[in-house]
Amino acid sequence: MAIGLSTYAFFWRASSRVPNPLGLAAMLEQTAESGAGVFQICDYAAVEALSPAELEKLRQRAVDLGIQLELGTRGLATDHLTRYLTMARALDVRFIRTMFNSATHKPTQDEALALLRCVLPEFEQYNIQLGLETYEQVKTRDVLAVVDAIDSPALGICLDPGNCVAALEYPHEVIELTASRVVNLHIKDFAFARQEGWVGFTYSGCLLGTGLLDYDALHQTIRPNERNINQIVEHWLPWQASAEETCRLEDAWTRHSLNYLYTRNPYANRSSHIL
């Protein structure tokens, strides 16, 4: 099992809102420097434009740094998942996260079943796992029903309990419901804050260990160390007063999250290039 960083852990530092946004190579280097053992390139469209030579350069640099790569995308379209499978093979990736819906397609449960059954034989052939993420756009029971119906070692759940609150699903219930099918974990904390004037609440991210995520219960239920399930750090960090302050806080949250997780997972794999 390894602990890693998602591109979502670099959300603001890689965005156009900051003066010198990080590119993919810089995020990979910083992942290694942090001591994390995995870099999940998630919802990062630029990776789709990389040439075979550029993919090989990225793969080799990850090998040199002792970093395991993972991929993340959205949607179940056959051509799209086949494309990501090809990229995964080029990058020595063993896990791809996806979601039911893309920007242009929202399949029914039956359509999702048919689409996944079309591509999963290739995933099984190349020993690459596909994880369907839990999130508010599709009820967790519906996602789980598809995974259960297919019952393939190449298909599981990418568990992110915080996403499901917007669908009025309790995080602890989502954890219990999906536990046996989880193959990847997204770790971020979250909290409600009452707005000024008592006119509603904001639901957003917070420093890991200070919000509503019961990490110890999650860890006890999922048993990531025993089951070799990678834990990937993400953030829902609101924009701060300035780009400088936002980037500083994002980096601080990342370092805190890694320390928090390694303290509770002392045998997790680490990068070989810790500074």
UniProtKB/Swiss-Prot annotation:
Pfam families: AP_endonuc_2. It is an enzyme of class 4 (lyase). It catalyses: 3-oxoisoapionate + H(+) = L-erythrulose + CO2. Its EC number is 4.1.1.120. Transmembrane segments: none annotated. Disulfide bonds: none annotated. GO terms for molecular function: carboxy-lyase activity. The keyword Lyase applies. The keyword Transmembrane helix does not apply. InterPro entries: IolE/XylAMocC-like, Xyl_isomerase-like_sf, Xyl_isomerase-like_TIM-brl. Gene3D superfamilies: Divalent-metal-dependent TIM barrel enzymes. Keywords: Carbohydrate metabolism, Decarboxylase, Lyase. Pathway: Carbohydrate metabolism. Involved in catabolism of D-apiose. Catalyzes decarboxylation of 3-oxo-isoapionate to L-erythrulose. This is 3-oxo-isoapionate decarboxylase.
